[in-house]
Amino acid sequence: MKVLTVLVPTYNVEKYLRRCLDSLLLPEVLEEIEVLAVNDGSKDGSADIARAYEKKYPQTVVFVDKENGGHGSTINVGIEKAQGTYFKVLDSDDWVNIGDFIEFVKRLKEETADAVICDYRKEHVYNGKSEYFEYKDLEDGKKYNLNEIDLNILHGEYFMMATTTYRTEVLRASGLKMLEKTFYVDMQYNIVPITKVDTFAYYHLDIYRYFIGRKDQSMNMDNFVRNQEHNKRMIKWLIEYYTGIEKDLTPNKMEYIEMILTYTLNTHYSIYCEYDKDHKRAYNEIREFDAYLKKTNQRLYDRLNCMAYVRYNRETQFKFVKVDGSKWHKVMVLARKVKGRFAR
C-alpha cells in the first residue's frame, strides 16, 4: 500500500502542470506515493500532459478524466479513489519543496497520527517575494491530542489545506462531501475532517509552495465581492453543518472549529460592511444574513459581537455600512460619537 496519495486537481493549467508533477515524481519516493491527476474538464492541453505522465510513471501516476464540476468535485473523486494511507491536496499550479518532501514521505511511513501538519510558503512570483508560514510554538515531530491541547499555542492560526495531510480513513469516516461548482470549498476541507481527528503530528518541514502569479490572485476582497454568492452558499453550509454536530464534539473541537468559523464569518461581514460598492444590496444582504445566523446558531451569532464593527452595525441595524468611498475608520468614528462610547 502506498504511504501517501497526492491529489492534483487539474483545470486549464498546461503552463504549470509539469512543474507541479515533476516536484512530486522523485526517484526517492516513486514507490511510496500515488499521484492522482484529476482533470476537471480542461479545455487546454492539461489532460494530454497528465496522460503522458501516467504513461511514463504507470506505478505512481493515475489519470482521471471527468466533466467540469469545480475544485470540490475533484477532491470528492480523489478521496474515493485514493490508495494511500495519507491524503494530501496539491493544486496543479503549486508545487512542493523537493528536499523537505522526500523527508516528509520518509517520516509518514512511521506515522500513526490522524493528521500531519507542516509549514508552507507563498511564492509571490509577480514581485519575487516569498512568505514563510509556520506554527512556531508546535514542536517538530511531536504528536498532539486535539482534544487536550491548549489551543492558545496556535495563536489563532488554524490548519489549512496547504498545511494539512489527513489519514485517508479519517477523511472517509468524516463523511466529507465537498460542494461542487462552488468557490471557497477549502473551508469544508479544513473543518469537516476535524470531527474525526483526535491526534495530529507536526513536522517543521517547508513542504507546500503556494503560487501567486498575479498581484490580484490571492483571496482579496474584490474577488470575494464578485463571488459573494459562492461565499454565502459555502458559509451557510458550514453554519448548518456545525449546528447539526456541535453537541457531539469535545469542548476543544468546538472551540477550534468556532475559531475557523469566526474567521470565515468575519470575512463575510467585511464583504458587505466594508467593500461592496452596491450599498443598497449590501445593506439588505447583511441584515438578512445576520438574522439568519441569529436564528440558526445563537452561539456563533453572539461570538461575533467581539468584533467592534459587527457589534456597531448590529446596534444601528446596519446603518453604518460603508458608504460612497468613505473609509471604515471614519464610519467607526461616527459610530462612536452616536453611541457615546469607544469600540474595544
Task: Please describe what each predicted stretch is.
Residues 3-5, 34, 188:
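Cell-envelope/extracellular polymer assembly enzymes that use nucleotide-activated donors
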Residues 32-41, 62-67, 92:
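Short beta-strand/loop segment that forms part of the nucleotide-sugar
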Residues 66-82:
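Glycine-rich, basic loop-to-helix element that forms the pyrophosphate-binding segment
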Residues 23, 39-48, 69-70:
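A conserved acidic beta->alpha catalytic loop
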Residues 87:
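Short aromatic/hydrophobic "clamp" motif used to bind/position activated sugar donors
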Residues 13-26:
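Short, well-formed alpha-helical segments that are part of the catalytic scaffolds
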Residues 71-75, 92-203, 208-226:
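Donor-binding/catalytic cores of nucleotide-activated saccharide
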Residues 113, 273-344:
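Membrane-interface aromatic/basic loop that binds lipid-linked glycans or pyrophosphate carriers
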